[in-house]
């Protein structure tokens, strides 16, 4: 295990390498200035990085990896009526980090972060003290996660999205919205409320977001013609990939095949699926060559089961 400390911010980070894939876990303690970021916002990637540099890293020139990703996610139930939130992360490169936040600065949450977005490479762990890069900002950009109330969120690319730009709202980097929601939302309704309070900007490609809560409610939050729109589940299950769901009855777009495969599989089982079956369904609907991780969150029990690089023989399990 390696540790990183920032005495000025009273931050302690503990990182452990779990496998040579590589896969790491991180426990993050202390104030990472996220609330300050929400008050200030950022209008571009350069502006965002400047805030991180000033508030946390205090070093210039920390690029964020250009990394497009195409993913799939769904919400269903198991036979015990536990709510399952499942997602694939498919992208060109990934260094997955299991992140825990267990302090007074936010709701407790468990999430997966792609450290490649934060300029990590496979040598960063061994040179952590001398090469901080953007490690201190890890908790700003979870790709998916669950908090102590059983609320979950995941990001997915939606190339057609157009974000709102209203003069009376603060603008955020779209990759940081999941952190905001994990910090503050207990339910889908609260997530929708918090999301509509801000403008957003993107770097490589815009996003849409799947959200779900322990009561079984789910929705996909999207941005069409500069307005936030919400598509709620019509059944006890819901699916999303990489095209806009709103006002798209033919479900046309990138990821249509994966969307239909998952939807049909869930329909045949009336939305009832075990965690093992959910992982298998994810594995059979990846983008070949881009598969990075498949994760199933149990929103009732607040657990995570995750596999990496299509290796379904090694399931890593975590409890919030």
Annotate each language-model stretch with its function.
Residues 153-154, 160-283, 288-291:
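A surface/extracellular/periplasmic glyco- and lipid-processing/surface-interacting theme
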């Amino acid at each position: 295990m390696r540790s990183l400390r920032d005495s000025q911010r009273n931050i302690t980070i503990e990182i452990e390498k779990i496998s040579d894939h590589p896969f790491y876990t991180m426990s993050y303690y202390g104030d990472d200035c996220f609330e300050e970021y929400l008050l200030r916002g950022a209008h571009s990637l350069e502006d965002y990085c400047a805030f991180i540099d000033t508030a946390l890293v205090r070093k210039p020139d920390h690029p964020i990896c250009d990394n497009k990703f195409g993913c799939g996610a769904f919400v269903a139930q198991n036979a015990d009526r536990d709510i399952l939130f499942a997602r694939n992360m498919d992208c060109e490169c990934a260094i997955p980090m299991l992140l825990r936040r267990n302090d007074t600065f936010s709701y407790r949450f468990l999430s997966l972060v792609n450290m490649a977005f934060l300029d990590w490479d496979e040598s960063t762990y061994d040179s952590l003290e001398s090469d901080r890069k953007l490690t201190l900002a890890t908790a700003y950009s979870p790709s998916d996660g669950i908090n102590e109330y059983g609320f979950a969120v995941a990001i997915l690319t939606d190339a057609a999205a157009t974000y709102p730009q209203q003069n009376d709202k603060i603008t955020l980097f779209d990759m940081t919205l999941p952190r905001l929601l994990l910090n503050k939302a207990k339910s889908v309704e609260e997530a929708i409320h918090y999301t509509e309070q801000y403008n957003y900007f993107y770097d490589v490609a815009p996003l849409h977001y799947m959200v779900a809560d322990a009561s079984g409610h789910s929705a996909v939050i999207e941005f069409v013609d500069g307005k936030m729109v919400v598509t709620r589940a019509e059944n006890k299950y819901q699916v999303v990939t990489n095209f806009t769901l709103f006002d798209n009855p033919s479900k046309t777009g990138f990821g249509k095949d994966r969307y239909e495969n998952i939807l049909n599989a869930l329909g045949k089982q009336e939305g009832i699926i075990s965690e093992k079956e959910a992982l298998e369904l994810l594995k059979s609907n990846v983008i070949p060559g881009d598969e990075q991780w498949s994760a199933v969150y149990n929103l009732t029990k607040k657990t995570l089961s995750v596999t990496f690089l299509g290796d379904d023989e090694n399931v890593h399990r975590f409890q919030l």
